[in-house]
């Protein structure tokens, strides 16, 4: 259970975060108690079905207890699997992640404020829902679009899918999170914010969200939250300047071919103008204070870094056609140098290298960047042709002398491939 999809942690708007932590701990304890009770009932049924009693039953129970102890000792992560208490810092991090999702329109904040009743528990034998519980949905149960949200929805949604760490911008990540906290806690939002800082051990929430040269804490925790085994799939991407002093946050499910262009025209270029004007103003002063000298140095660095970021994103935008079917790592790979968290940057850099080498030519992104290489491969690999929708153009089903059907490339497949390549490179 996490607060990311279950707003129970925030279901009492007038309560403190500590009250929420205590409430969540009680839920965990109750869940463990119910699980233990159910397990005991299952064990009793199994013993009865197999006619196990006395010494046989005692031997099995001793063996199970021994296995459990060995599993605990051999836990590779060294983590306690007993979830009878809640971690305040972890829950606070999940709450803030929830608020970011609210700003992007991922989560329906009305569940957290109590305006809407919590979704019913699903039947275990029902088909999996299209959306996670608590998501902002349309009438068909799909993620809501701008024209599918009630006019009276209580908070503004950043439909463009871009937020920014910039106190002067209306899409400032910190301010959008604070809007969500204010909607949930009203006049108590200030004390809730301070309590969150205390739990997280940070001076301010802006510091918590900020990306540094080597990455920031929020994204590190977000990445961990959306990682399982070897699969890493963060939803909120920090795209930063080299020093991390300016960061755009992209919402993965809403990426499009226009995203990077929007990032440049709506965020980076206005910021460039602002910083350049401030730099010129400070530089023109005859006598500056130490604070102004420091501000001038910062502005000089930011002018250069924003120009580099703008140029890089426009270059990537020319070939970047994100397709969610490719998955997070492949989609994010071209942007690897703009992530500051080193382990994630390395993962994406390695992925980009494999994309360049043709290891992932099944991906839509590979097809859009290297159409000649990928389409030529489709002549020899029908599964690849199917993946890119070229199977009917390049392959035909034939019948041999024995009447057995088989697939083979069309006689004019090379010419067709050249035509397909020319269409992709126009």
Named regions from a protein language model:
Residues 2-4, 10, 19-22, 29-33, ...:
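General structural signal for secondary-structure boundaries
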Residues 55-426:
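Terminal accessory regions of large proteins
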Residues 50:
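Active-site-proximal loop/hinge segments that shape catalytic or ion-binding/gating pockets
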Residues 1-47, 268, 279-280:
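Extended amphipathic alpha-helical segments enriched in small hydrophobics
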């Amino acid at each position: 259970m996490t607060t990311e999809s279950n707003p129970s942690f925030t279901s009492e708007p007038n309560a403190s975060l500590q009250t929420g932590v205590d409430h969540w701990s009680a839920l965990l304890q109750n869940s463990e108690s119910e699980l233990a009770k159910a397990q005991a009932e299952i064990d009793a049924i199994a013993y009865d079905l197999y006619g196990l009693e006395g010494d046989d039953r005692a031997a099995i129970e001793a063996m199970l207890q021994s296995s459990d102890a060995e599993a605990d000792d051999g836990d590779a992560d060294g983590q306690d699997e007993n979830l009878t208490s809640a971690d305040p810092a972890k829950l606070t991090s999940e709450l803030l992640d929830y608020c970011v999702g609210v700003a992007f329109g991922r989560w329906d904040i009305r569940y957290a404020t109590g305006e809407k009743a919590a979704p019913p528990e699903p039947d275990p034998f029902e088909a999996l829902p299209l959306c996670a519980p608590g998501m902002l949905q349309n009438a068909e149960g799909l993620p809501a679009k701008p024209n599918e949200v009630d006019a009276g929805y209580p908070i503004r949604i950043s439909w463009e899918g871009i937020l920014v760490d910039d106190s002067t911008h209306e899409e400032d990540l910190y301010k959008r999170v604070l809007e969500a906290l204010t909607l949930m806690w009203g006049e108590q939002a200030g004390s809730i914010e301070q309590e969150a800082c205390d739990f997280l051990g940070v001076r301010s929430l802006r510091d918590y969200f900020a990306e540094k040269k080597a990455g920031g804490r929020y994204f590190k925790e977000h990445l961990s939250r959306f990682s399982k085994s070897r699969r890493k799939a963060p939803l909120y991407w920090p795209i930063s300047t080299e020093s991390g002093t300016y960061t755009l946050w992209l919402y993965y499910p809403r990426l499009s071919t226009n995203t990077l262009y929007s990032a440049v025209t709506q965020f980076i270029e206005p910021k460039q103008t602002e910083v350049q004007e401030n730099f010129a103003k400070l530089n023109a002063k005859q006598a500056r204070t130490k604070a102004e000298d420091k501000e001038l140095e910062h502005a000089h660095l930011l002018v250069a870094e924003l120009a580099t970021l703008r140029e890089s994103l426009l270059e990537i935008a020319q070939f970047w056609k994100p397709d969610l079917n490719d998955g997070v790592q492949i989609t994010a790979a071209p942007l690897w140098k703009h992530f500051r968290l080193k382990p994630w940057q390395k993962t994406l850099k390695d992925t980009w290298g494999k994309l360049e080498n043709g290891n992932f030519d099944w991906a839509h992104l590979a097809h859009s960047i290297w159409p000649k290489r990928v389409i030529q491969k489709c002549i020899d690999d029908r599964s690849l042709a199917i993946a890119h929708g070229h199977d009917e153009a390049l392959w035909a089903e034939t019948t041999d002398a024995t009447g057995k059907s088989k697939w083979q490339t069309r006689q004019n497949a090379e010419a067709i491939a050249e035509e397909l390549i020319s269409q992709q490179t126009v």
